[in-house]
Amino acid sequence: IRDARGWRFLPDVPDPVNGFTFLSEAYAASNPDFGGRVTVPVLWDTHHHRIVNNESADLIRMLNSEFDALDGVDTSFDLYPPALREEIDALNARVYDDVNNGVYKTGFATTQEAYEESFDRLFATLGELEARLDTSRYLVGHAVTEADWRLFTTLVRFDPVYVGHFKCNEVRIADLPNLSNYLRDLYQRPGI
């Protein structure tokens, strides 16, 4: 949870590896001279005691395949199948710019013009995704891919956070039947 002191581990959900109270301690342990912004998510290397990566786009790909050789890793699915990579990459770029980052561009716009531009792009893209899901259960292909999970992170917060706080309020996800059902389907997956 993030408070005035930064990202902190809750007492009832402590850091089980290092006992850190704040995520900034992980950044300092990785690089004592670190002076940048502490961000999440973070992948921590327990052997070398350092942050390996903190970029969500990289992490989803790393977690998809980098550990496949380890015993006990379920390799029965691939979130980034070779035959769909070009389409996934194109959709990820659009979703990131217009939706994932679009809610922030809208919410933190400093001019009316910037607000309207990002607002219009956000809801145009949501409309296109709603139409896309009218003929397909998933965004790309016939199984869940990284494109679905990258959109999920914004959709799951959209109605409770972005509609009111960021003024992304043309329509709620709950009012878009395909996106709403899609979000519900992803949310009900084991481990979510």
PLM features per residue range, with description:
Residues 1-192:
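C-terminal alpha-helical interaction module
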